[in-house]
């Protein structure tokens, strides 16, 4: 990871998902992608906050290591998001088959998740309820932080004069008003 950082790496996606942890090299051990991402202050990262991919402890560890300003909340939602149980494609245009049951998308053999089916308001709720993140910080992690990561925070991500005002209204339980 250090070499990648020297070449310009600034962000890692989907913290903990398909990432190496501690690597054993003979009698020695070295940190993998997970440990590097958590320890390197200049790296930003994101968590799939669906309440399935990561337990509360891993969400809390990510928040503790990265803070509210370097950790983005993503849904990683696929085509089955907000849809009834069934078979949906995920990934590329033609996609790979996934099974959505009780709101959870898995591979057909049920050995892994196939993206997620949550919407952003649900991800914010997960961060508040499972990771004990204050609501205002969870909203920032779903708006300003991602905008900053992709370099559009001068236009999006917060309510400020001169920025695009994308507003979503929700109630106390973070259900979106239509």
Report the location of each language-model feature.
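Histidine/acidic-residue-rich, glycine-tolerant segments that coordinate divalent metal ions
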Residues: 1-31, 82
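His/Asp/Glu-enriched, well-ordered alpha-helical/loop segment
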Residues: 29-51, 63-75, 80-170
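Catalytic cores of alpha/beta
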Residues: 1-3, 56-62
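Short, Lys/Arg- and Gly-enriched loop/turn segments at beta-strand edges
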Residues: 174-178
């Amino acid at each position: 990871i250090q070499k990648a950082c020297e070449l310009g790496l600034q962000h890692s996606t989907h913290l903990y998902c398909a990432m190496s942890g501690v690597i054993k090299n003979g009698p020695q051990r070295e940190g993998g992608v997970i440990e590097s991402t958590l320890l390197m202050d200049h790296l930003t990262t994101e968590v799939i906050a669906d309440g399935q991919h990561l337990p509360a402890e891993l969400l809390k560890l990510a928040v503790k290591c990265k803070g509210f300003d370097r950790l983005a909340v993503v849904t990683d939602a696929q085509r089955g998001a907000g849809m009834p149980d069934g078979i949906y494609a995920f990934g590329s245009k033609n996609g790979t088959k996934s099974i959505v049951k009780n709101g959870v998308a898995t591979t057909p053999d049920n050995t892994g998740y196939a993206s997620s089916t949550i919407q952003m308001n649900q991800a914010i709720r997960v961060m508040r309820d499972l990771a004990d993140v204050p609501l205002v910080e969870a909203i920032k992690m779903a708006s300003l932080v991602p905008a900053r990561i992709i370099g559009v925070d001068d236009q999006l991500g917060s309510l400020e004069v001169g920025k695009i005002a994308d507003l979503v209204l929700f109630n106390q339980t973070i259900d979106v008003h239509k």
